[in-house]
C-alpha cells in the first residue's frame, strides 16, 4: 500500500510517498496520524502543501537575506565588568541578543553562534544563523566598563 508520510521517521521525511505493508499502514501508520493513504485527492493536497511550504521558505530566506544586508558590518560592542583583562562571569548569547536589540535588530539568541565562551576582553568573530542557508558574520567587541 502506498502512503504519504505526515511525520518524519525511519520510513522517510514528511511528504514522501512510500510503499508499506497493508496491515502496517491500516493498523499503525494511519491511526497514529503518521501517514495517510496515497489517494488522488491526498496527492493533490500534498502538492498544494508542498507549494505553499516552498513559498513560505522562499519568503523566510528573503527576510533572512534582508536582515543579512542590514547586519552586514555591524560590530556588537559590550561593556562589561572586568579586572586585569578577565571578565567577571562571561558574555552570553543573551547579552549579544540584548545588544543587537538595542541597535534595532530583533534576533533569536539561540541562533547566535559563538566559537567559544567569551571570558576575556577583546575582539571575537561571531555569527548569526538567520536561515539554514544564510549565516551572517559579525564582530563582538568586549571592553571593560569605566
UniProtKB/Swiss-Prot annotation:
Matching entries from PROSITE patterns are given as: RIBOSOMAL_L9
Record-linked Gene3D superfamilies: Ribosomal protein L9, C-terminal domain (3.10.430.100), Ribosomal protein L9, N-terminal domain (3.40.5.10)
Acetylation among keywords: no
What keywords is this UniProt entry annotated with? Ribonucleoprotein, Ribosomal protein, RNA-binding, rRNA-binding
Tell me the domain of life. Bacteria
Q: Does the keyword Transferase apply?
A: no
Biological source species: Deinococcus deserti (strain DSM 17065 / CIP 109153 / LMG 22923 / VCD115)
Pfam families per UniProt? Ribosomal_L9_C (PF03948), Ribosomal_L9_N (PF01281)
Q: Which family does it belong to?
A: Belongs to the bacterial ribosomal protein bL9 family.
Q: Which GO terms describe its molecular function?
A: rRNA binding; structural constituent of ribosome
Gene symbol? rplI
Q: Name one GO cellular component term.
A: ribonucleoprotein complex
InterPro entries registered for this protein in UniProt: Ribosomal_bL9, Ribosomal_bL9/RNase_H1_N, Ribosomal_bL9_bac/chp, Ribosomal_bL9_C, Ribosomal_bL9_C_sf, Ribosomal_bL9_N, Ribosomal_bL9_N_sf
Function in brief: Binds to the 23S rRNA.
**Which biological process, per GO, is one annotated for this protein?**
translation
Q: What is this protein called?
A: Large ribosomal subunit protein bL9
Amino acid at each position: 500500500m502506498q502512503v504519504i508520510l505526515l511525520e518524519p521517521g525511519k520510513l522517510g521525511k514528511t511528504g514522501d510517498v512510500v510503499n508499506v505493508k497493508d496491515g502496517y499502514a491500516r493498523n499503525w501508520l494511519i491511526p497514529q496520524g503518521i501517514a495517510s493513504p496515497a489517494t488522488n485527492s491526498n496527492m493533490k493536497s500534498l502538492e498544494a502543501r508542498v507549494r505553499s511550504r516552498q513559498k513560505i521558505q522562499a519568503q523566510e530566506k528573503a527576510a533572512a537575506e534582508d536582515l543579512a544586508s542590514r547586519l552586514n558590518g555591524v560590530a556588537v560592542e559590550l561593556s562589561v565588568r572586568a579586572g586585569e583583562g578577565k571578565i567577571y562571569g562571561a558574555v552570553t548569547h543573551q547579552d549579544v541578543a540584548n545588544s543587537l536589540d538595542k541597535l534595532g535588530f530583533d534576533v533569536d539568541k539561540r541562533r547566535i553562534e559563538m566559537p567559544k565562551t567569551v571570558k576575556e576582553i577583546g575582539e571575537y568573530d561571531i555569527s548569526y544563523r538567520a536561515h539554514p542557508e544564510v549565516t551572517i558574520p559579525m564582530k563582538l567587541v568586549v571592553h571593560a566598563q569605566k
